[in-house]
Amino acid sequence: MTSSNFPKAERLLRRPEFLQFNEGASKLHTQYFLVLLKPNEGTGTRVGFTVSKKVGNAVVRNSIKRRLREFYRQNKSLFISADINIVAKKGADVLDFHQISTELAAAFGRLRKKYA
């Protein structure tokens, strides 16, 4: 059974880790999210979340990040072994958890087919 936690080893935490997506990352656009994917050197899946001030105030941004973390925690099996950054687009603040899950599950299904 897959562990349902989100340890630091599975997170992108530092600025240089996020800047690596500027060059050579694969992009997948959905209506409310941009998924950036870059293969890593065998370190497993690492995930980061970016929600800019364009999306909303701090309360809204933190709420979206909590929902994204929960989606990752519950759906680790959908994620391929790579560095992944999920960027929320303007308008993502109106989504509830179920809508986020549906949209991202479809996106990661497409990524699995592409990189399988």
Swiss-Prot record:
Cited SUPFAM superfamilies: Ribosomal protein S5 domain 2-like
A GO cellular component annotation in the UniProt record: ribonuclease P complex
Catalytic activity: Endonucleolytic cleavage of RNA, removing 5'-extranucleotides from tRNA precursor
Gene Ontology molecular function: any one: tRNA binding
Gene Ontology BP terms: tRNA 5'-leader removal
Known role: RNaseP catalyzes the removal of the 5'-leader sequence from pre-tRNA to produce the mature 5'-terminus. It can also cleave other RNA substrates such as 4.5S RNA. The protein component plays an auxiliary but essential role in vivo by binding to the 5'-leader sequence and broadening the substrate specificity of the ribozyme.
Keywords annotated in UniProt: Endonuclease, Hydrolase, Nuclease, RNA-binding, tRNA processing
Name of this chain's protein: Ribonuclease P protein component
Database matches in Pfam families: Ribonuclease_P (PF00825)
Protein family: Belongs to the RnpA family.
Assembly mode: Consists of a catalytic RNA component (M1 or rnpB) and a protein subunit.
UniProt cross-references to Gene3D superfamilies, sorted A to Z: 3.30.230.10
InterPro entries cross-referenced by the UniProt entry: Ribosomal_Su5_D2-typ_SF (IPR020568), Ribsml_uS5_D2-typ_fold_subgr (IPR014721), RNase_P (IPR000100)
Matches recorded under HAMAP family: RNase_P
Protein EC: 3.1.26.5
